[in-house]
Amino acid sequence: MEAGAELVARARLICGEQHVITAPAALSVFRSDGLRREGPLPLAAILPGGAPEVTSVVAACVATGMPYAVRGAGTSDRGGALPVADGVLIVLTRMRRMVAASAADDEITVEPGVPPAALGQAVQAARWFEGPDPPIGTVGGHIAETPGITNVGGLDVVQPDGRFVRLRARDPGYDLIGAFPGSRGRAGIAVAITLRALPPG
């Protein structure tokens, strides 16, 4: 079995057949980004439903030697949402759960596919993002594409080699979280994001 077919078969077992898109007509919507630039048609668009599925899909890509790109809502204007040649696209829009919210701590943990505008509905009167109001796209895409975000309190990350790691801002040592905003997925895929509320103003 060639690598593309093997990866698609594995992804269907991991995510369910309905969440692995291979028909060219259906894949065409994943070719462009927020500026309507077009990339190559991916071999498949894979829509995992949670962190374990992302971990397994990335591990399958590594095992089969299949290149992959990661996409949220596809609104990026920096090319980060475009497919790679002869590869697959991991699409995170199914991952829209609010994992935990603490009004007392002014923190919220969400999956990467949550729209930024939805955060205020979970914890009222808190401000989570600089920039447009409401911000477009997804929380994961905003973090991956925007350098200098300073209110990330924690990340659950699937690394490019398929390993899972949990990072917290209070952890001693190097600031690994600080390297993640603006990395465009090169540092891994954030499958859960903890944000601290920004100061008023």
What is each stretch, according to the model?
Residues 1-59, 75-106, 135, 144-145:
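N-terminal flexible segment immediately upstream of the FAD-binding catalytic core
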Residues 60, 80-81, 122, 179:
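Hydrophobic/aromatic ligand-binding patch that stacks against planar heteroaromatic rings
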Residues 97-101, 108-201:
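FAD-binding subdomain of flavoenzyme oxidoreductases
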